[in-house]
Swiss-Prot record:
Its EC number is 2.1.1.228. Keywords: Cytoplasm, Methyltransferase, S-adenosyl-L-methionine, Transferase, tRNA processing. GO terms for biological process: tRNA N1-guanine methylation. HAMAP family: TrmD (MF_00605). Disulfide bonds: none annotated. This is tRNA (guanine-N(1)-)-methyltransferase. The lineage of its organism: Bacteria, Pseudomonadati, Pseudomonadota, Gammaproteobacteria, Moraxellales. It is found in: Cytoplasm. InterPro entries: Alpha/beta_knot_MTases, tRNA_m1G_MeTrfase_C_sf, tRNA_m1G_MeTrfase_TrmD, tRNA_m1G_MTases_N, tRNA_MeTrfase_TRMD/TRM10. GO terms for cellular component: cytosol. It catalyses: guanosine(37) in tRNA + S-adenosyl-L-methionine = N(1)-methylguanosine(37) in tRNA + S-adenosyl-L-homocysteine + H(+). It comes from Acinetobacter baumannii (strain ACICU). The gene is trmD.
Amino acid sequence: MFFAVITLFPEMFEAITAYGISGRAAKRDIVQVTCINPRDFAEGNYRRVDERPFGGGPGMVMMAEPLAKAINHAKQLASQAGCVHVPVVYMSPQGKTLNEQAVQQFVDYDGLIVLCGRYEGVDERLIQHYVDQEWSIGDYVLSGGELPAMVLLDSIIRRLPNVMSDEQSAIQDSFVDGLLDCPQYTKPDQFEGLDVPEILKSGHHANIEKWRFLQRYQRTLERRPELIEQVTLTKQQKKWLSDEQG
């Protein structure tokens, strides 16, 4: 999958390309992550990419022209890589909140061009003409779009085929089917007086699967009850709940 990131701080994305699951995916050429600095497309000796906002007010606004040139360059690179469906995504607190369903849709794309804002944001005309989607990672403000962009890339990359060493691990993640994940345990059997649930050591896979589902359902009900209404349960899961509730 092709990713082009428009950012003033390309070095930050070594966190994606050099480490962990996403780093291994990059080394294996499952993903291509290219960072494009809009300063390279700015004019003048200082290569400015920001200016004071019209109408006054605090801070600076990123200028449309260097960003547009950077996006067009990214589109050329995507075309050279054989990618057809490559939307431009702007990471913004004003965008829709990212969730697992959106991530799964991104997985089906050929690639993404991700725009990282800075300062007070981006000239609205650039958004109107070049941005296809705006996404947020939550109702709070960060110093720039780089961290949200890394969240987006990591969440997509780990869902791509052949990226995870254990495909089942990704399938069982929180939110994949609308439920939170179940509690996880590893060695030792006892830690500070707390034991691993016996059922997890029983080797009875069907009972373990049932236990994990019931734990996930109960945890979601307690911590994120608004998610329960959106969950579609299988026939087996409904039976497990019915048995548990007597």
